[in-house]
């Protein structure tokens, strides 16, 4: 699963996801892509589940790029802990995703295989997504 090797600070504020994604919102590497349509936190486990589903379906053909990285730690307190005594310890990592962000890219396979693979990966995501095809420059 994905997580940063080291970070400047151990704990982050929760923040808020307002607006649309201004970065990572166009196809850069592959020919097909899965794009987010809703804002959400996507955990490293969900990213890995989507990647596994796509690689299993595409088999040897095709290359996959993961365009999001979980760099935000989410902290949790132990159950039945009293208030106070500081913030909880980091439990898992999430990627903050806004609408328009490209989650995965794929190339080297036919459109039908890519669409089916992305559809399986989309079921692993906690948000609505759409399938994109890169337009050829004339």
Curated annotation (Swiss-Prot):
<protein>
    <recommendedName>
        <fullName>Large ribosomal subunit protein uL16c</fullName>
    </recommendedName>
</protein>
<dbReference type="InterPro" id="IPR016180">
    <property type="entry name" value="Ribosomal_uL16_dom"/>
</dbReference>
<comment type="similarity">
    <text>Belongs to the universal ribosomal protein uL16 family.</text>
</comment>
<keyword id="KW-0689">Ribosomal protein</keyword>
<dbReference type="GO" id="GO:0005762">
    <property type="term" value="C:mitochondrial large ribosomal subunit"/>
</dbReference>
<dbReference type="GO" id="GO:0019843">
    <property type="term" value="F:rRNA binding"/>
</dbReference>
<dbReference type="InterPro" id="IPR000114">
    <property type="entry name" value="Ribosomal_uL16_bact-type"/>
</dbReference>
<keyword id="KW-0150">Chloroplast</keyword>
<dbReference type="InterPro" id="IPR020798">
    <property type="entry name" value="Ribosomal_uL16_CS"/>
</dbReference>
<dbReference type="InterPro" id="IPR047873">
    <property type="entry name" value="Ribosomal_uL16"/>
</dbReference>
<dbReference type="GO" id="GO:0032543">
    <property type="term" value="P:mitochondrial translation"/>
</dbReference>
<dbReference type="GO" id="GO:0009507">
    <property type="term" value="C:chloroplast"/>
</dbReference>
<dbReference type="Pfam" id="PF00252">
    <property type="entry name" value="Ribosomal_L16"/>
</dbReference>
<keyword id="KW-0687">Ribonucleoprotein</keyword>
<dbReference type="GO" id="GO:0003735">
    <property type="term" value="F:structural constituent of ribosome"/>
</dbReference>
<comment type="subunit">
    <text>Part of the 50S ribosomal subunit.</text>
</comment>
<dbReference type="InterPro" id="IPR036920">
    <property type="entry name" value="Ribosomal_uL16_sf"/>
</dbReference>
<keyword id="KW-0934">Plastid</keyword>
């Amino acid at each position: 699963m994905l997580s940063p090797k080291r970070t400047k600070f151990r704990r982050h504020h929760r923040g808020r996801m307002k607006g649309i994604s201004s970065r990572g919102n166009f196809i850069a590497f592959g020919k097909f892509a899965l794009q987010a349509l809703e804002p959400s936190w996507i955990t490293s486990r969900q990213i890995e589940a989507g990647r596994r589903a796509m690689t299993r379906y595409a088999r040897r053909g095709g290359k996959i790029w993961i365009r999001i990285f979980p760099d935000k730690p989410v902290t949790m307190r132990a159950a039945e802990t009293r208030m106070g005594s500081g913030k909880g310890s980091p439990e898992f990592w999430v990627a903050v995703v806004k609408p328009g962000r490209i989650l995965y890219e794929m190339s080297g396979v036919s459109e039908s295989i890519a669409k089916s693979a992305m559809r399986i990966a989309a079921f692993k995501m906690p948000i609505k997504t759409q399938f994109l095809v890169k337009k050829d420059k004339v």
